[in-house]
Amino acid sequence: MLWFKNILVYRLNKEIALSMDELEQQLASLAFTPCSSQDMTKTGWVSPMGDRGEALIHVAGKQVMMCARKEDKILPATVIKQALQDKVEKLEGEQGRKLKKTEKATLKDEVVHTLLPRAFSKFSQTFIWLDLDKQLVIVDSGSAKRAEDNLALLRKTLGSLPVVPLNFNESVESKMTQWVRSGELPAGFTLMDEAELKAVLEEGGVIRCKKQELVSDEIATHIEAGKFVTKLSLDWEDRLQFMLCDDGSIKRIKFSDTLREQNDDIDKADFAQRFDADFVLMTGELSALIERVIEVLGGEAE
């Protein structure tokens, strides 16, 4: 199973009123199909278990996993430009005149259609986890745009998806700055050795620290000068490490070896059973972490 590396968390404002069978059917209506010769991009649902599964959702209790696949045809701008230039020069030579802007635009479309069947494909996939117990949608992505694109696919699939990014009562950057300044963290959390500090004003600069003692005079000087901590590496309960960001996203998640080895007693040949056990383990850990992060940031804003 692919363990999540980055998560963006969204609040469901209305329960998804579908049974799991109905959800499976809805996803099947937008199952992934490869690009045809004239498609630039295609997106759809595939099994979270990849080629080893057929179901488009994986369910464990009230936790549901889905996977969106995207295919993009790669046509470098330089290739299009050169092919267009060759065609324009040929036509202008034959007709003895300069082509109009609209004519060049039409030619460009023709060039793209001609090149598309020979273009390479780039594939990507994004996992989406529905926590129907806590009414959260968690996207395995560090990019807000990519997350929103995949939520748009889910919204199209379901007909409606009223979600908003998780918001907190306290400022994330103010809280992280307080932790670094004081060296005192909430129970269960430990400072690691990486952070990013930014000044409120853009011209104030950015400081990125790696392998750095964060509770130090050097870092304190930057904070006193008006910089805020915008990214902070943390350890939680010796079970996982991550980077907390000022937008509330949790990135570069690394589960401890001890945690990941908990299901090693399951025969690796039994892919489905191991996938399910790892899914239960991962969602349980991340669900507890999300709940704790909400708590230490003053609760969820209404």
Swiss-Prot record:
The lineage of its organism: Bacteria, Pseudomonadati, Pseudomonadota, Gammaproteobacteria, Enterobacterales. It comes from Proteus mirabilis (strain HI4320). GO terms for biological process: DNA recombination; regulation of DNA recombination. Keywords: Cytoplasm, DNA recombination. May be involved in recombination. It is found in: Cytoplasm, Nucleoid. One of its GO terms (cellular component) is cytoplasm. The gene is rdgC. This is Recombination-associated protein RdgC. Belongs to the RdgC family. One of its GO terms (molecular function) is double-stranded DNA binding. InterPro entries: RdgC.
